[in-house]
């Protein structure tokens, strides 16, 4: 383990829906990379227990997707809550990055920040206020160099760890093919 302020923290949450006022977090995963996007470590992937009532009332997309991936069943069987997930995730991150140093990295992470602000504030506060949002670059590529998008091959499993790895791979493609670095 090497604590380095240049390391990047990648995070993804899976949720029961898109509204933090009514929906909840189902899963969290983190990955730490160096500044060149090489994976240094995978943090804990934690399925968070949610009530059967909440899980049974997810919208059709979430019910189908999280049922198919096995996430719904993992959440029903889990004994972990948000506080445990925060504690374990911060303990992992402190081994790699000083608090406040890394932007939050991932795809559409503004959404993750909204949920973290409500349910995982201590973890949200661990990040720098800046974001490294791969979806911003995707939107620019769609408009300025759409042929690059065909070179991004994501699994799209909607499991947090897989989604993070997809985001890292996607940014590597953009770095090479869009920014020519």
Curated annotation (Swiss-Prot):
EC number(s) given by UniProt: 3.1.15.-
Catalytic site positions: 129
Entry-linked InterPro entries: Exonuclease_RNaseT/DNA_pol3 (IPR013520), Oligoribonuclease (IPR022894), RNaseH-like_sf (IPR012337), RNaseH_sf (IPR036397)
Disulfide bonds: none
GO biological process, one term: DNA metabolic process
Claim: Cytoplasm is one of the keywords in the record: yes
Subcellular location: Cytoplasm
Keywords: Cytoplasm, Exonuclease, Hydrolase, Nuclease
MF-aspect GO terms: 3'-5'-RNA exonuclease activity; nucleic acid binding
Enzyme class: hydrolase
Annotated Gene Ontology cellular component terms: cytoplasm
SUPFAM superfamilies named among the record's database cross-references: Ribonuclease H-like (SSF53098)
Domain (Exonuclease) ranges: 8-171
Family: Belongs to the oligoribonuclease family.
Cited function: 3'-to-5' exoribonuclease specific for small oligoribonucleotides.
Cited PANTHER family: OLIGORIBONUCLEASE, MITOCHONDRIAL
UniProt-listed HAMAP family: Oligoribonuclease (MF_00045)
Name of this chain's protein: Oligoribonuclease
Organism in which the protein naturally occurs: Pseudoalteromonas translucida (strain TAC 125)
Organism taxonomic ancestry: Bacteria, Pseudomonadati, Pseudomonadota, Gammaproteobacteria, Alteromonadales
